[in-house]
Amino acid sequence: MEIKVVQDVKAIDADILVVNMFEGEKTISEIANKYAIEQDNFKGKFGETYLLPTYGQEVYKKVLVLGLGKKSELTPNKLREATYKAIKKCMQMEAKKVAFSLEGIEFDYSEQFTMGTLIADYVFDKYKSEKKDNKVREVYVQANEGIVRKAEKIAAAMTFARNLANEPAQLATPSELANIACDFGLETKIYNREECEKMGMGAFLAVAKGSAQEPKFIHMKYSVENPKKRIAIIGKGITFDSGGLDIKPASSMLTMKDDMSAAA
């Protein structure tokens, strides 16, 4: 998916133009106001959507009204969630080219809009022989381009972490995660079993006894000149967790590989 920053989204010949609506207010689209609000009494509650054709009156084919709820209650996180829902709806309609017209929002929505858009685009289909072709390919929005590009990098990192978490446990082994960690260009130290024993990491090693895979304790360090403070982030990296003494039920089998998500 490619996000393009433009000045006039209504001039884009999109498959769908997404317009936001606050409760008790109208949209920028006269067609949406006439049919969604006046005829069908669409309220614009948070997360609700209303799709209608433009009947050839506009360059874009359809309008998707996206409810944002009460204006006073809209937060950046809620905007990200709403954007996610809008993209998913556009994917259901097999739209390839989507434009967003976000009006009346009282904060810079560039980052959260980008995050919601790209998170909605995520799917792990690496091992599927048949892949669905219902993705939105182009998204147009009027936003801060610098913030959009930065948010794209954050979303790419999230995608990378999700891909690691979704890999089968026989492939995403402790040794494989250690190899990946060493490729990031950070100061990285991988501690083996013997080194962990010397540090008294009994609980960590007790978990490792349940696997034929060798344990790897990964320590990554990012340094800058004259740091104001030190921050330690600890992420659980159990690559397959069946529950230990309390074995998880069969219904939890699909998520046993997810226990390394924080480390990813």
Region annotations inferred by a language model:
Residues M1-G237:
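Short amphipathic alpha-helical segment within the helicase RecA-like ATPase core
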